[in-house]
Swiss-Prot record:
Record's GO cellular component terms: nucleus
GO biological process, one term: flower development
Organism encoding this protein: Arabidopsis thaliana (Mouse-ear cress)
Main function: Regulates lateral organ growth. Functionally redundant with NGA1, NGA2 and NGA3.
Protein name: B3 domain-containing transcription factor NGA4
Primary residence: nucleus
One annotated GO molecular function: DNA binding
Subcellular location: Nucleus
DNA-binding region: 36-145
Protein's gene: NGA4
Length: 333
């Protein structure tokens, strides 16, 4: 061991002894100045056993003399342990690197690619010395990379998954009385819901700060809403549908009595309630997808099973008996 190495070891021991009592002080004091951070790359923690220092930081904080090939830098970690790294400039790659001692630091701290190493500088307190004569010291710290969990419980986190991928997407609110807790879903629905959130399907969930859930509908959902005048989200493939507050009008009550007759070669059902001889007549023999309803009053209407309003193509209204009398038939039975 040569004299220069002995002097460095002796100086390092003195720094360790004089700064051990001030470890917590430095890491909680404003006198510790932050220099820079370095996010580790795979090569920084690989078999090359070297840490590349960004050029702007190296020239600013660790400058080398023109005729100097390298030097030794000493750092103290938050536990008070001293670390010594060989610092030099590589002409082949034109980069500043820390080599000797770095692999041991990586192994002991269990560093991986994506972790961050931070460098600080300060000085050892000495009330008897002038500020410019105080012994300077540098610090090194580390922190692991931020972990990202892609599957979250929707009751505990406010994240956005599966945002719509089409430009005409809209978000529709789901009122609390119609929203089902996530844990109340059967296990099959829970698994399907998590998979769709992770894979980023064309519809998703947004939970804002006040706990109101929103679901993004597809263009087909918007088509139904324009035609039906409703605002209930449409979610496909085993995902429960959450209706909004507005409920479509129900069908008219069933008539109490029904009479059948044949009119113009068509079976006609005459229903009456409360003793009224004239009432609602449904014309049989038509397609169930487009029912025809004959009403003799102008005040009421009802929707077909598809939610379509009865129109001139699917319903006929007779204001009186003149239409039947004109054709030679009477409505009276």
């Amino acid at each position: 061991m040569n004299i220069s190495t002995m002097n460095l070891d002796q100086e390092l021991a003195e720094i360790r002894a004089s700064s051990s009592d001030h470890t917590n002080y430095f890491y909680s004091s404003e006198r510790r100045e932050h220099m820079f951070d370095k996010v580790l790359t795979p090569s920084d923690v690989g078999k090359l056993n070297r840490l590349v220092i960004p050029k702007q930081h190296a020239e600013n904080f660790f400058p080398l003399e023109d005729n100097q090939n390298g030097t030794v830098l000493d750092f103290q970690d938050k536990n008070g342990k001293m670390w010594r790294f060989r610092y030099s400039y590589w002409n082949s790659s034109q980069s500043y690197v820390m080599t000797k001692g770095w692999s041991r630091f990586v192994k002991e701290k269990k560093l991986f690619a994506g972790d961050t190493v931070s460098f600080y500088r300060g000085y050892i307190p000495d009330d008897n010395a002038q500020p410019e004569r105080r012994r300077k010291i540098m610090f090194i710290d580390w922190r692991p990379r931020a972990e990202i969990n892609f599957v979250h419980n929707i009751n505990n986190h406010n994240f956005v998954f599966g945002s719509p991928t089409y430009p005409t997407a809209r978000f529709y609110p789901v009122t609390p009385e119609y929203s089902m807790p996530y844990r109340s879903f059967p296990p099959f629905y829970q698994n399907q819901f998590q998979e769709r959130e992770y894979l980023g399907y064309g519809y998703g969930r947004v939970v804002n700060g006040n706990g109101v859930r929103y679901y993004a509908g597809s263009p087909l959902d918007q088509h139904h809403q324009w035609n039906l005048g409703r605002s209930e989200p449409l979610v496909y493939d085993s995902v429960p549908v959450f209706p909004a507050g507005r409920v479509p009008p129900s069908a008219p009550p069933q008539p109490s009595t029904t009479k059948k007759l044949r009119l113009f070669g068509v079976d006609v059902e005459e229903s009456s309630s409360s003793g009224d001889t004239r009432g609602e007549m449904g014309v049989a023999g038509y397609s169930s997808s487009s029912p025809v309803v004959i009403r003799d009053d102008d005040q009421s209407f009802w929707r077909s099973p598809r939610g379509e309003m009865a129109s001139s193509s699917s319903a006929m209204q007779l204001s009186d008996d003149e239409e039947y009398k004109r054709k030679g038939k009477s409505l009276e039975l």
